[in-house]
């Protein structure tokens, strides 16, 4: 009797398992095409920017050679700051404002306490419009266009030992040539959001200056300025930003 009961129990168990497997085989799962969308770009922040710009200094170096100074060499390092925000009305679009500048000086001492030198300073202030493409999470590529105004200041000085009373004399010379420009700047930046609040940037740009106007000592206009003296040149930039970065 016990054997018969165990046999029936085993038979029922095997039948139940087999029936369950048949039911599972008869179940058909419908395939659904799930479209995975890339997240839109959103960034709001500000921070430090640095740029190595390769500008033409050939005509400036001719002047350096004529007065006994060493040549200037590119690149020039510029530093400053930028702030930007995404525009919600147009997805992935961003506007920004930045300002940065830098300078180099070539100086040499001569006999009789005479010091000659040239200081070359360049700066940019302007706006930028960028469009963000999110490649993968936290990584975006942003091509864009910058525009604004730029300046080049060239200070040429020749001084000897100087004291306060020498202001009344002509024992020194110092002239400042100041050039002002408009510029446009195509650029491409690669930006990585380390966290939702910290972002790193690496990019390239090429400012193009036009509409130049030159003055000496902010008084007299200067003519026959070499065309190479412009804020034009390929540049590599980097940045460190804090804010809100959601992409």
Where are these regions (language model features)?
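Gram-negative (and chloroplast) outer-membrane scaffold detector with strong preference
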Residues: 90-167, 181-182, 192-194, 233, ...
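Outer-membrane beta-barrel transmembrane strands
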Residues: 72-77, 81-85, 178-190, 194, ...
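Membrane-embedded beta-strand positions of outer-membrane beta-barrel proteins
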Residues: 44-50, 83, 95-97, 129, ...
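Short glycine/proline- and aromatic-enriched beta-strand/turn motifs that initiate or cap beta-hairpins
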Residues: 21-88, 241-247
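Extracellular loop and loop/strand-boundary signature of outer-membrane beta-barrel proteins
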Residues: 65-70, 107-118, 169-176, 221-229
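Predominantly the C-terminal beta-signal and adjacent terminal strand-loop region
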Residues: 189-247
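Solvent-exposed loop segments that connect transmembrane elements
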Residues: 159-171, 216-222
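Bacterial Sec-dependent N-terminal signal peptides
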Residues: 1-29, 244
């Amino acid at each position: 009797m016990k054997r018969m009961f165990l046999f029936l129990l085993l038979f029922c168990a095997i039948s139940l398992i087999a029936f369950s497997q048949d039911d599972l085989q008869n179940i058909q799962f419908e395939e659904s095409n799930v479209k995975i969308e890339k997240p839109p770009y959103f960034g709001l922040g500000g921070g430090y920017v640095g740029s190595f710009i390769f500008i033409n200094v050939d005509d400036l170096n001719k002047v350096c050679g004529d007065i006994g100074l060493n040549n200037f060499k590119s690149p020039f390092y510029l530093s400053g700051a930028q702030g930007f925000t995404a525009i919600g009305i147009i997805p992935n679009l961003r506007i920004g404002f930045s300002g940065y500048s830098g300078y180099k000086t070539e100086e040499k001492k001569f006999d009789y306490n005479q010091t000659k030198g040239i200081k070359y300073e360049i700066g940019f202030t302007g706006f930028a419009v960028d469009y963000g493409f999110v490649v993968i999470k936290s990584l975006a590529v942003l091509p864009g266009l910058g525009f604004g105004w730029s300046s080049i200041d060239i200070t040429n000085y020749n001084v000897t030992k100087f004291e306060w009373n020498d202001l009344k004399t002509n024992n020194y010379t110092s002239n400042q040539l100041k050039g002002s420009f408009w510029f446009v700047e195509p650029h491409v930046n690669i930006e990585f959001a380390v966290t939702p609040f910290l972002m790193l940037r690496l990019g390239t740009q090429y400012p193009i200056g036009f509409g130049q106007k030159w003055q000496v000592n902010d008084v007299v206009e200067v003519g026959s300025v070499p065309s190479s003296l412009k804020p034009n040149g390929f540049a590599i930039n980097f940045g460190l930003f804090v804010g809100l970065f959601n992409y």
